[in-house]
Structures are given as structure tokens and as C-alpha cells.
Amino acid sequence: MVNLIPSPEAVMQILKRTGAYREGHFVYPSGKHTPHYFQMPLAFRYYDTARVLAVALSRKFRVDRDISSQLPKVAVISPSSGGIPVGFGVREALNAEQIYWAEKEEGKRRFRQYVNQGEINPCIIVDDIIRSGGAIEETVGLLKELGAPLIGCGAIVRFNSAPDRIGDVPIKSLVEFESPMYDNSDDCKDCEDGVPEEHVRF
């Protein structure tokens, strides 16, 4: 029988093979330094890889009876553009009825689609990577304004520094990743060792 939920080690091998996971000396837009960097769109540029990852994450939701009992009357929500390919893959695998995505405009996160109160089914928030959980929390705020209940949340990779639940909803992930983060160059070991910096964006 095919294992539809690959191990975290197998997922990391996929991310390394596709170039979505790299090691080095990286500086985030926030100014923080780290020896690890995920660029998830590189994994989702390949259909076969994207499908493996999306189906694997969808299985995490399908085995949850509280979620599976509400399918297909469910909405998959992507809190940012990076989560859109994951969202479409998970929606297809779950045969969920709706999909929405949010974007940040003028400093405020809002849904790309025009949505009225009461139009959204019970929601599963899906992203490619959760580093701090800020985008997830902002999206939950949007859902509350629209009266849409949150029944699930997940990502391909969740940093251990991010929350592991939103309210009483646990955050599911294929990989839980721990990485040192340095607020500035004074605290960074790679800076101390003279390792060249690479400035990256999300």
C-alpha cells in the first residue's frame, strides 16, 4: 500500500532535491540572520512534486474526523500568494467546494475575491510555510469578520518558533523545522566566521 503521508525526512529530501531548501548564510527582509532558507515555489514548479506534497498535507486533514465529516462543504484558504499552489492542490485532493486566497495591500491583508458575510464554508487555512504565524493570525481575523468558522490549519513546513495551534485548532504540517535566528549581525555566528551573506525575500 502506498504511503500517502511521507515521513518528514522524505519531505525534506524532496525540498533539497528541488532546491526549495538551502543551507548557507541568509539575511531575511526583517534583517534577521539564519543558516537555513526555504523557497517553496521551487518545489511547486514541478507538477509531480506539487501533487505529492499537496496530497500528503490533505491526508493530514482527511484523517481528522471533525474535518472529513464536513467535506466537501469546506473552503480552503491561502493566506498569501506563496500558499496558493498548495491551496489549489489540497482543495483538489479533498474535493473541497470552495477556495479563497488573501493578499496584503497597503499593509492590510484582505481576500482577493469579494466576499460577503456568511458566504464562506467552514475553513481550512493552508500555506506553504509558517515562520511566525503572523499571516495565519491575520487571516483568522478576516474569517471572524465574515463569520466563517476555522476547522483546520496546516502547511508543508512549520518552524518551531511559530505557534502549533490557532485557538483550539492544531496546526498540521509535513515538517516541523527548527532553525536558529539571529536578530542582527552582532549575534550571528556566520557573521563572526566571515561567511558571505545572501539577502533573500519571501
Question: At which residue positions do the language-model features occur?
Answer:
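Active-site-facing substrate-recognition patch
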Residues: 1-67, 202
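Short amphipathic alpha-helix with an adjacent loop that forms part of the alpha/beta core around
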Residues: 66-68, 112-118, 185
